[in-house]
């Protein structure tokens, strides 16, 4: 369960990157892993109302990605766009990647490990 919860938290980290302070994100992760994830997990696992209604969660994927996705969407809506993404007239400022080798390494780690 710890790995499932960490996966949900990592989904959120990708959505709020560069827009939230580290301390605030840690507080949010404690709330997510301590309250939100267990409550939504109990709905599906352990005889919760979703399991009684016939809901099947293959390997925990619905709960993990549901919790992470909804929390990420909520964080993105609350925080808004990254600073410098839009100019005063509303036009989009291009923000090219800053470290392509590190991004490539991260992609390979996710794909193959």
Where are the language model's segments positioned?
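Hydrophobic alpha-helical transmembrane bundles of multi-pass membrane proteins
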Residues: 1-113
């Amino acid at each position: 369960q710890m790995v499932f919860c960490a996966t949900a938290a990592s989904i959120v980290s990708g959505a709020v990157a560069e827009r939230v302070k580290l301390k605030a994100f840690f507080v949010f992760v404690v709330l997510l892993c301590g309250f939100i994830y267990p409550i939504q997990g109990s709905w599906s696992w352990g005889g919760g109302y979703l399991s009684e209604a016939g809901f099947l969660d293959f390997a925990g994927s619905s709960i993990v990605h549901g919790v992470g996705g909804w929390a990420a969407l909520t964080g993105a809506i609350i925080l808004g766009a990254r600073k410098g993404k839009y100019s005063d007239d509303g036009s989009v400022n291009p923000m090219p990647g800053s470290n392509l080798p590190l991004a490539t390494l991260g992609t390979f780690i996710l794909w193959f490990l």
